[in-house]
């Protein structure tokens, strides 16, 4: 494995830590190769050996084990023209209880002309009284393809924890060739039991997920995806899923009343979409570790 040296930092509990990742790949001699890599504690990047038949992989690691109030993380991924890559996170991101300050995560995904990027973060677990503000900005070039998503779990259901107070502000902004084509915002703040339990809102769900596919195949895959979801029995009392197309983007929403089944179904759908896009119809090994 290859990784860049990390930069030292001094932790200040009142201010949190500031970590960042800057990662770009370029096409050289018909292969996607690392162009530049910068990271600072508590973040680092590992470039593992590429599995057969797969695009080059990058793994983002948060060595602190989770986010506390005041932490700020900044991730920027750049896929230069015609590159093929997959970037994922090593493990679930935990957002711990805060005494008042917000944890902030800024993500920028640049997918230049003819490139294909998969951004596969593992689930975010929001602890009771955790506070998270996350923004994902996407910049698509001509004929760019992106498969990306996020999954959020509301509390540690395996420990019987209920999410009662806190903040979740999770937004997406997608630009295609300079024009904003999709904006999305989920905001829960203060007393979280009302929106989490209300039948017209999250109806007691333990987690939710969003998947986004951009590319010329996106709209054409809507009906095949719906058919696959039905045949695979993805919907049931523990999981609800819906898919649609917005300005040429395929958007899939999930609600789960069982966190394990939500993650399992989400991964199966991701694998199916990979197969439709010419990649192996499987999840990276790290997903199941």
Swiss-Prot record:
Membrane-spanning intervals of the chain: none
UniProt entry keywords in alphabetical sequence: Chaperone, Cytoplasm, Nickel insertion
InterPro entries for the chain: UreD
Protein's UniProt keywords contain RNA-binding: no
Principal location: cytoplasm
Entry GO terms, CC: cytoplasm
Localization annotation: Cytoplasm
Biological role stated in the UniProt entry: Required for maturation of urease via the functional incorporation of the urease nickel metallocenter.
Family per record: Belongs to the UreD family.
Protein name per the record: Urease accessory protein UreD
Organism whose genome encodes this protein: Magnetococcus marinus (strain ATCC BAA-1437 / JCM 17883 / MC-1)
